[in-house]
Regions:
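Alpha/beta-hydrolase superfamily serine-hydrolase fold, recognizing
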Residues: 1-275
């Protein structure tokens, strides 16, 4: 019997050797995207300094274009919209406006605040994106990890009108209770109330939304089990839901690939954008 403690399956750094290299790559690629893709930076959707979004545009005329929101992950406590600008490459190449959303981070704020922020970001898009050449009637969403969790909050039972046509949920967290026993207990201390209120596995959802639940083949077991449970949960509610296992991908390489043309993840994203 080994004397070494088991690795926490939620602590991604312990399971992805190239974690730091991938983070450095996506940050570098994001700066390239910001330099090369037409954009409007730091558009405010609220009064707080954290309540901003970046809009990226395809080349050419902007007239009632599809719109896609992306919500970044980081266990609600790290990263920013700037780190994920590269996702806009796939979205704009598919002919849509990319909206990369920022939000406040735990533990400085609690989860209720973050959920409220992303919902208000969606409402800003509904009310204002037409002024930027977008069609709010063609709105889709994606998110990775904690961002996938937050993306579900844009079409759950509390968020009416829904207005989301399709969603891509990548490496998502849909039952928050296991996280209370993970390394995150010392970092963000998810409360019993937060786990109860904000676990998507306990929510109802808009049955008109098409959802792809994706997970990397090399992710740790909880991400696979949560994907399976949430797929079944949505299916029982009548949503059109598919589940994709990304071959050879881990929690970090899968999100990196969202902005790399020709990868399975980027193809899934482009398909959702075109829904």
């Amino acid at each position: 019997m080994s004397g070494h403690p088991a690795k926490d399956p939620f602590r991604i750094r312990d399971h992805v050797v190239e974690f730091d290299d991938i983070v450095a790559e996506i940050v570098r690629r994001s700066e390239e995207t910001r330099a090369n893709v037409p954009m409007v930076a730091d558009v405010a959707y609220g009064a707080d300094a954290t309540e901003t979004m970046d809009l990226f545009f395809p080349e050419g005329k902007r007239d009632r274009l599809p719109v896609h929101m992306f919500i970044h992950g980081g266990y609600w406590r790290m990263f920013s919209k700037r780190d994920y600008s590269y996702v806009a490459e796939t979205v704009t190449n598919a002919g849509a406006i990319a909206v990369i959303v920022d939000y406040a981070l735990m533990p400085t704020v609690r989860m209720a605040r973050i959920v409220d922020q992303v919902r208000r970001a969606k409402r800003w898009v509904f009310d204002n994106v037409a002024h930027h050449g977008g069609n709010p009637g063609l709105l889709t969403v994606s998110g990775h990890s904690a961002g996938a969790h937050l993306a579900t909050m844009l079409f759950d039972g509390d968020e009416r009108p829904f207005g989301i046509k399709a969603a891509l949920l990548l490496g998502g967290l849909y039952d928050l209770k296991p996280l209370q026993m993970s390394f995150l207990a010392a970092e963000i201390a998810i409360t019993d109330e937060e786990a109860r209120r904000f676990s998507p596995i306990d929510h109802s959802f808009d049955p008109s939304v098409g959802v792809d639940i994706s997970v990397g083949a090399d992710e740790t077991p909880p991400f696979h089990s949560q994907a399976a449970l949430f797929t079944d949960h949505l299916d029982t509610q009548g949503l059109t839901v598919s589940r994709t296992t990304l071959g050879g991908a881990n929690h970090m390489s899968s999100v990196r690939d969202l902005g790399l043309a020709g990868t399975e993840a980027a193809s899934l994203l482009a398909r959702v954008v075109a829904a």
